[in-house]
Amino acid sequence: MGKDFKSGGGNAGGKPFNKGPGGPGGRPFNKGPGGPGGPGGKFGGGRPGGPGGKFGAKGPRGPKTIIVKHRLEGVFICKGQQEALVTKNFFPGESVYNEKRMSVEENGEKIEYRVWNPYRSKIAAAVVGGISDIHIKPGSKVLYLGGASGTTVSHVADIVGPTGVVYAVEFSHRSGRDLVNMAKKRTNVVPIIGDARKPQEYRFLVGMVDVVFADVAQPDQARIMGMNCQYFLKNGGHFLISIKACCIDSTNEPAVVFAAEVQKLKEEGLKPEQQLTLEPYERDHAMVLGSYRA
């Protein structure tokens, strides 16, 4: 359930994408029927059915893939055999983490999109769950704390596009290598191998940003967010923070932990405006959205 700090109203939790059906079997001409389709995957159809007999006709084709705009700018929904959240691929022809891609012809030009899996991305989970806004859109400048290997960073880069920039900070050198490799082709990503607790060490690399997102899973993450906002977030800018309850306090109920973290964010000079749980995609996680010096 979501929680709106302004009105007290909640946002309904998002429904997980349904598993798609397997592919149909082939239609026989002289011989027996083709094999049944495989089971559906997390985001849609499984393997197609087996072919018909020697002279068998092909099975019917699935529904045409259609891309429609999501209410959040720069985010899209793929409608076809299954429904999925997608972003427009900044570097067509290549996946980042073996995610599914699809091409759609738009105004005589083929545009490639990538599936944005809410089980692999907390921002995607928040979008599917009904968050009011993420304030990340084409042209945005984003500071991403806890970039890991770049799974979600790559989708944020898709959204902000060539006129935006994503400064991605990651402490782990192992994950950082993957992040750096991803950024070689996504030129709007600036990878920074550093400690998010020490923003002064990368202040010469990062400009003022529109949004700060943090997914650092540390007990002092509210303080980490506060420091980075003071250094880099524009007045009137926005922040998003993913809170993993057990990383803060494993002895308390998640709701109690979330409430305490919201209070800490307020003490850092931030203004929390909405809280959203990330079930069923992430257990005991919440996303908090807010503004800074608005």
From Swiss-Prot:
Q: Which residues bind S-adenosyl-L-methionine?
A: 151-152, 170-171, 195-196, 215-218
Signal sequence region? none
* Parts of the chain that traverse the membrane: none
Q: Which UniProt keywords apply?
A: Methylation, Methyltransferase, Nucleus, Ribonucleoprotein, RNA-binding, rRNA processing, S-adenosyl-L-methionine, Transferase
Role according to the record: S-adenosyl-L-methionine-dependent methyltransferase that has the ability to methylate both RNAs and proteins. Involved in pre-rRNA processing. Utilizes the methyl donor S-adenosyl-L-methionine to catalyze the site-specific 2'-hydroxyl methylation of ribose moieties in pre-ribosomal RNA. Site specificity is provided by a guide RNA that base pairs with the substrate. Methylation occurs at a characteristic distance from the sequence involved in base pairing with the guide RNA.
Oligomer status and interactors = Component of box C/D small nucleolar ribonucleoprotein (snoRNP) particles. It is associated with the U3, U8 and U13 small nuclear RNAs.
Q: What is this protein called?
A: rRNA 2'-O-methyltransferase fibrillarin
State which gene encodes it.
FIB
